[in-house]
Swiss-Prot record:
UniProt name for this protein: Small ribosomal subunit protein uS4
UniProt-listed Pfam families: Ribosomal_S4 (PF00163), S4 (PF01479)
Protein family per UniProt: Belongs to the universal ribosomal protein uS4 family.
Annotated keywords: Ribonucleoprotein, Ribosomal protein, RNA-binding, rRNA-binding
Subunit structure: Part of the 30S ribosomal subunit. Contacts protein S5. The interaction surface between S4 and S5 is involved in control of translational fidelity.
InterPro entries reported for this sequence: Ribosomal_uS4, Ribosomal_uS4_bac-type, Ribosomal_uS4_CS, Ribosomal_uS4_N, S4_RNA-bd, S4_RNA-bd_sf
Residue ranges of every copy of the S4 RNA-binding domain listed in the record: 96-156
Name of the gene: rpsD
A single Gene Ontology CC term: small ribosomal subunit
Top-level taxon: Bacteria
UniProt record, GO biological process: ribosomal small subunit biogenesis; translation
Organism: Klebsiella pneumoniae subsp. pneumoniae (strain ATCC 700721 / MGH 78578)
Function summary: One of the primary rRNA binding proteins, it binds directly to 16S rRNA where it nucleates assembly of the body of the 30S subunit. With S5 and S12 plays an important role in translational accuracy.
GO molecular function: rRNA binding; structural constituent of ribosome
């Protein structure tokens, strides 16, 4: 499945919630009727079956983190193999992706922008360049911007925007040095309550 390259707001409208694909800070512009489905007048939303609700939740989370279908299914399989709650394990794996950590640290205004920084070799982990967006960041890993990328206006703009966001408690960021430490995996209480990972587990458990 190819990565979606169309309008970002359309995806958020389809899922009925702000996926933070367009802006890393402010909610979607009020001109965008988030509760209205895509289309000139917004298609009437049919009443979903249990399967439909589960599928929509999976699509929402997958799009939020910018993960393709096969990747997402593999994350679920890995989460199911790990000890503990499968749904929480899944979210921890998604949060541990390098592109997501770069976004959470404020180096990218969106996850897509953070992914681009990674692929363009602008990101280092423990002093070594890593250009794989799905790289799993571990506890106490230090993520930083390469020296030659520190002058990029988009990085500076992203850091300014990040000042308006709530600081993740599982990260420690030095904006001046443009580096941060992944102190620990986030706990479920640290993450958005808007995600219902139990629906995803139910979907894949069938």
């Amino acid at each position: 499945m190819a990565r979606y390259l169309g309008p970002k707001l359309k995806l958020s409208r389809r899922e009925g919630t702000d996926l933070f694909l367009k802006s890393g800070v402010r909610a979607i512009d009020t001109k965008c009727k988030i509760e209205q489905a895509p289309g000139q007048h917004g298609a009437r939303k049919p009443r979903l079956s249990d399967y439909g609700v589960q599928l929509r939740e999976k699509q929402k989370v997958r799009r939020m983190y910018g993960v393709l279908e096969r990747q997402f299914r593999n994350y679920y399989k890995e989460a199911a193999r790990l000890k503990g709650n499968t749904g929480e394990n899944l979210l921890a794996l998604l949060e541990g992706r390098l592109d997501n950590v770069v976004y959470r640290m404020g180096f990218g205004a969106t996850r897509a922008e953070a992914r681009q920084l990674v692929s363009h070799k602008a990101i280092m982990v423990n002093g070594r360049v890593v250009n794989i967006a799905s790289y799993q960041v571990k506890a106490n890993d230090v993520v930083s911007i390469r020296e030659k990328a520190k002058k990029q206006s988009r990085v500076k703009a992203a850091l300014e925007l990040a000042e308006q966001r709530e600081k993740p408690t599982w990260l420690e960021v030095d904006a001046g040095k443009m580096e941060g430490t992944f102190k620990r995996q986030p706990e479920r209480s640290d993450l958005s309550a808007d995600i219902n990972e139990h629906l995803i587990v139910e979907l894949y458990s069938k």
